[in-house]
A protein has these predicted regions:
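N-terminal "assembly arms/tails" that initiate or stabilize quaternary assembly
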Residues: 1-80
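Surface-exposed ligand/attachment interfaces on beta-rich extracellular proteins
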Residues: 33-34, 139, 145-152, 246-254, ...
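Glycine-centered loop/turn motifs
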Residues: 42, 59-63, 67-71, 236, ...
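Long, contiguous amphipathic alpha-helices that act as assembly "spine/axial" helices in icosahedral shell
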Residues: 47, 77-153, 162-179, 204-207, ...
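Residue-level recognition of conserved beta-strand edge/terminus positions
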Residues: 48, 264-266, 309
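Short helix/loop capping segments that flank catalytic or ligand/cofactor-binding pockets
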Residues: 55-58, 87-88, 97, 182-185, ...
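Autoprocessing Asn-cyclization modules and mimics
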Residues: 182-301
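Internal mixed-charge
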Residues: 216-220, 280-343
Length: 343
C-alpha cells in the first residue's frame, strides 16, 4: 500500500530514540563521514589524512619563510553496500490493526525493528572491519580476565595505543556483554568514592576506565582462528616489515586468515618477541607470504616459528580517528522513480 512519508517521519524519529538504547558500541565510537549528498554503489569518497609535522628553528628575517611545505594526503574509500528494510502492510492487516486501535503502535514497532536490523548489520560490519584491520593484540581476546577483579588487559591495550602515538582524548573500547558483566563486578568501579561517579551503579551504563570510553555491542562475535600449523619464517625480516615470507606450513583447510592473532618464536636464533600481531592478509598455501597490519617490533630470521593464537571473541580499543564510517543516501535517477512519495 502507498504511504505518506511526511507523517511517517515522526514515527521514524520516535523509533530512533528506542533503537539508540540497544547494545550499540561501534557506531558512536568511530568517525562518521556522512552528508545529504547521494552516492551509487562503488562510488569513491576521499578522506583527508594529515601527516607528521617537523619542527624547525626560528631565524630572524624580514619576510615570511616559504621553504617549508606540509603534505596532506588522502584515503579513498568506496560505498560497497546498499541495504534497506521493507515494511509492506496489506489493507486487510491495516484495517484489523486500526479496528483494534493498535495500528500506530504496531507500525511504530515495525519501524523500530527495521532500524534495529540495519543498526545491527552496521555494528557487525564495523566489528569485522576493525578485527581485520587491528595492529596488535593483548591478552586472550577479552579485555577482562575471568575473575573480573582486575583491569590489567584494558590498561595494557591502552599502553599499546599510546606507545604507538595514539591521542588520549577520544579512545573507545567496545566489548561484548560477558566482558561488560565482568567490568560491572570490579569492586572499585562500583564504589562511587573510588570510581568518582555513581553512574555504573545507578544507571547501568559503562563509564570511562583509565580515560577509555567503554561501550558494549551486540556486534562482537567470535573469531575462528585459521588451521595453519608448522609455518616458519623463511627469510630475514627487518623491524617494521609487514610482509612476512613463510614456508613449511600445513594448511588444514583454512590456513592463516585475516584477523588471526599470531606470535613469532625464536627457533631460528632471532630475538624473542612477545608481541601479538594481527594478520591483515592471510594465506591458504603451505608457503608464501602473509601481511601484518603493523610492522615487526623485533627482526625475525629464518626458522622462527609462527604460532596462531586461539579462537576468541575480540574486544577492540581504538581512537575515533582510526575508523571512518562512510554513509550516503542511495543514488536516485534524475527523472525520479516510481515512488508515490519521498522525504
Amino acid at each position: 500500500m502507498a504511504l505518506t512519508l511526511t507523517g511517517l517521519a515522526n514515527d521514524i524519529y520516535v523509533s530512533a530514540d528506542l533503537v539508540g538504547r540497544e547494545l550499540v558500541g561501534y557506531i558512536p565510537s568511530v568517525t562518521m563521514n556522512s552528508s545529504d549528498s547521494r552516492a551509487a554503489i562503488g562510488d569513491s569518497i576521499k578522506s583527508a589524512i594529515t601527516t607528521s609535522a617537523t619542527a624547525a628553528g626560528i631565524t630572524e628575517a624580514m619576510s615570511v619563510p616559504n621553504d617549508d611545505t606540509y603534505t596532506i594526503t588522502n584515503s579513498t574509500m568506496s560505498i560497497d553496500q546498499q541495504r534497506a528494510v521493507r515494511i509492506p502492510i496489506e489493507g486487510e492487516q491495516t484495517r484489523t490493526l486500526q479496528n483494534n486501535g493498535t495500528y500506530s503502535t504496531t507500525y511504530g514497532n515495525a519501524i523500530t525493528q527495521a532500524m534495529r536490523a540495519l543498526t545491527n548489520e552496521c555494528e557487525s560490519f564495523l566489528h569485522t572491519t576493525i578485527k581485520e584491520g587491528a595492529g596488535f593484540a593483548t591478552g586472550d581476546g577479552s579485555l577482562f580476565n575471568t575473575s573480573g577483579s582486575e583491569l590489567d588487559e584494558i590498561a595494557q591495550a591502552r599502553k599499546i595505543l599510546v606507545d604507538e602515538g595514539c591521542p588520549t582524548d577520544d579512545i573507545s573500547a567496545v566489548i561484548d556483554t560477558l566482558s561488560g558483566a565482568r567490568l560491572r563486578q570490579v569492586a572499585n568501579l562500583l564504589n562511587a568514592n573510588q570510581a568518582g561517579t555513581g553512574d555504573i551503579r545507578t544507571q547501568g551504563i559503562l563509564i570511562p576506565v583509565f580515560g577509555v570510553n567503554v561501550r558494549e555491542s551486540a556486534g562482537v562475535a567470535s573469531h575462528t582462528k585459521g588451521g595453519m600449523t608448522g609455518a616458519d619464517v623463511n627469510a630475514s625480516e627487518p623491524v617494521g616489515e609487514t610482509t612476512i615470507a613463510f614456508d613449511g606450513g600445513t594448511v588444514n583447510t583454512t590456513g592463516i586468515t585475516a584477523g588471526d592473532v599470531i606470535t613469532f618464536g625464536n627457533e631460528g636464533g632471532g630475538t624473542a618477541d612477545t608481541t601479538k600481531y594481527v594478520v591483515g592478509t592471510g594465506s591458504t598455501s603451505t608457503s608464501g607470504t602473509i601481511v601484518l597490519n603493523a610492522g615487526l617490533k623485533q627482526a625475525r630470521v629464518a626458522s622462527d616459528e609462527i604460532t596462531l593464537n586461539n579462537t576468541h571473541s575480540p574486544s577492540h580499543m581504538f581512537h575515533r580517528n582510526a575508523v571512518e564510517l562512510v554513509m550516503r543516501a542511495p543514488a536516485m535517477p534524475d527523472g525520479g522513480d516510481g515512488a508515490d512519495d519521498v522525504i
